[in-house]
Amino acid sequence: MKVLMVASEVAPFARTGGLAEVTAALPAALRRMGHDVRVIMPFYRCAAQTELGVRKARKSAEVSLNGETHKGFLRQAALGDVPVYLVENREFFSRDYLYGTPEGDYPDNPRRFAFFCRSVLQFLKRMDFRPDVIHCHDWQTALIPIILRLEAADDPFFARTATVFTIHNLAYQGLFPAPAIAETGLPSALFTTEWLEYYGQLNLMKGAILTADLITTVSETYRREIMTPTQGCGLEGVLARRGDDLFGIVNGIDTDEWNPAADKRIFRNYSARALAGKAADKLELQRELGMPAAPSVPLIGMVSRLAEQKGIDLVLELLPRLAESELQFVLLGTGNACYLERLNSFRSKGAANISINLGFNDPLAPKIYAGSDLFLMPSRFEPCGLSQLIAMRYGTVPVVRHTGGLRDTVVDVTRHPREGTGFTFEDFTADACWEAIERALAGYRDRESWRRIMRRGMHRDVSWHNAAGRYETLYRMAADTRRG
């Protein structure tokens, strides 16, 4: 099949979170299955600064939005044997950040990503690439299924092209003031409750949910959750209406990149059969971060965006307990300014057993996955989560809240001693999280039992193979609906 993957970020060209990892690894997995998969994204300043062989493709597009014409140019690179196209427009994409500064989103985001989506459709024609499926990711690409269903339904070029729209996080819907519809190039007649209007605002994700041939999200539990008032973020009714066309597929990870037996970014390699190297990784991590080098002290790691969704409020509440405990805790993260300020304030107190690392530090993340004994994910909600999959791959036992993709991927040791791969808690409270940590510590003291838990996690298939197979099935379903 011919598949175009459209995303606002793709690793390693640009990334702010797990979306970029998915849109890099899934195309590669599908390519290995024999499909002609290509990827397209904006050409951000950070992509221009990479040494990934981005070159000009000598194709251009012109997009008119609200009376102004914007020109785009196509660039091309590759991830392995997957072609990657990048849409260039310096006004829109040559900026320090992808979506906004720490103070807030860029006010012209509707126009920026409308330009991107409309350019994508033009460039397909310039390249004469007619995909069977266009797979769109999150609100930044939502305009593509909307255009193909409501504006270009009679365009013969796309007559046999189906759309699949993936919701990676329903909390980010592409909500804008009503006048922003003019910035997208869509007719104002679509600003109705039937299509794009949402409590007086423009909602791009709502439009994509209503117009895509099929919709996916990134775990089966999250699929069920988002059709309820608790987790539906106001779109539960729209999602329930499309419930038969909504599928949950758990993400995988790139098991070549995330492989403790071969990872050159960590201090010492190891495997499920030969775990000795992990102890060396722990000691080196402790030394690098200026913590006491203590092999027997349990070390909890956390690599996270600093956002309300990720349970950072619970972490802040737990920090005094952690500081007074016999544990060590390492946090790496960047994000919300108020969390940065509060974590900086705690860091200034100088607790010897706590290392708080704020800002983007790519080299440190794999060292934390490898050197930690436990990995904390106290998420308020979690559509899928990749960190728990990476942690298990590295023999680091996850302690997670029992929600979304965490529920689908981490088996609680307390409930299932012979199958368990981690420790879970239900209530979103610091006490519930601490109780799960204490259960994990009790397990940690039984070294032989702990090694069995580690190995179960390391043996779990967290690759993209199964997920890619499910996407392949959905692509065929979507394409069949277009062929009638």
Swiss-Prot record:
- Gene3D superfamilies membership: Glycogen Phosphorylase B
Q: Which InterPro entries match?
A: Glyco_trans_1 (IPR001296), GS/SS (IPR011835), Starch_synth_cat_dom (IPR013534)
What GO molecular functions are on record for this protein? alpha-1,4-glucan glucosyltransferase (ADP-glucose donor) activity; alpha-1,4-glucan glucosyltransferase (UDP-glucose donor) activity
Q: Where do the annotations place ADP-alpha-D-glucose binding?
A: 15
Keywords, in A-Z order: Glycogen biosynthesis, Glycosyltransferase, Transferase
| Enzyme superclass (EC) | transferase
User: Which pathway is this protein assigned to?
Assistant: Glycan biosynthesis; glycogen biosynthesis
One matching Pfam family is: Glycos_transf_1
- EC? 2.4.1.21
- Please provide, in alphabetical order, the Gene Ontology terms of the cellular component aspect for this entry: cytosol
Q: What catalytic reaction does the record list?
A: [(1->4)-alpha-D-glucosyl](n) + ADP-alpha-D-glucose = [(1->4)-alpha-D-glucosyl](n+1) + ADP + H(+)
- Biological process (GO), any one: glycogen biosynthetic process
Q: What is the annotated role of this protein in its UniProt record?
A: Synthesizes alpha-1,4-glucan chains using ADP-glucose.
Q: What is this protein called?
A: Glycogen synthase 2
The coding gene here is: glgA2
